[in-house]
Amino acid sequence: MVFRRNTRVGVYVDVANLARNGGYGMRYDVLREFACRGDAEPVRLNAYVSFDPERAEQDAAYREGQYAFYSLLRDFGYKVIQKNVKWYTDESGNRFGKANADLDMAVDALLQSENLDRVVLATGDGDFIRVVQALQNKGCRVEILAFENVSADLRRE
């Protein structure tokens, strides 16, 4: 008798990348259902979000909207990993914010892959090519979910 366990799946969502590239209004409950198709067991559901503390201090609607969104993600079973926006000024005096969660997402996926059969990366960012290759080398099936502006190299991988 052959014992077949359910497929163990991990979902890693770059929320800002999806929102910027056609995924605004993403149905995270549907994403979970899609990832767990075929009776797959969700071992890890991570959502990487950016948060601007300066803006939240001045804009109650932004703050409350973000907190409500994070609460919704948690209700769907996602672990919310928050990256605070850091503000920089370039040599021309232009101010810009950055809250890049790519490294956190990559490290988490690689560390947790020991317990996964399939990894769903919800991002179109070409920086994840080596992560995809490393996960595949570890024996994981990797699926990419993205909408617009998907890296051509990532599509091929």
Regions found by a protein language model. Give the residues of each.
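Active-site histidine-anchored catalytic micro-motif
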Residues: 100, 114-156
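Structural recognition of alpha->loop->beta junctions
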Residues: 75-76, 106-110, 152-157
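Internal catalytic-core helix/loop-beta-alpha segment
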Residues: 82, 86-122
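Domain-level signal for Mg2+-assisted phosphodiester chemistry and nucleotide/NA-binding surfaces
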Residues: 1-97, 141, 148-150
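Well-ordered alpha-helical segments embedded in enzymatic catalytic cores
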Residues: 30, 104-108, 127
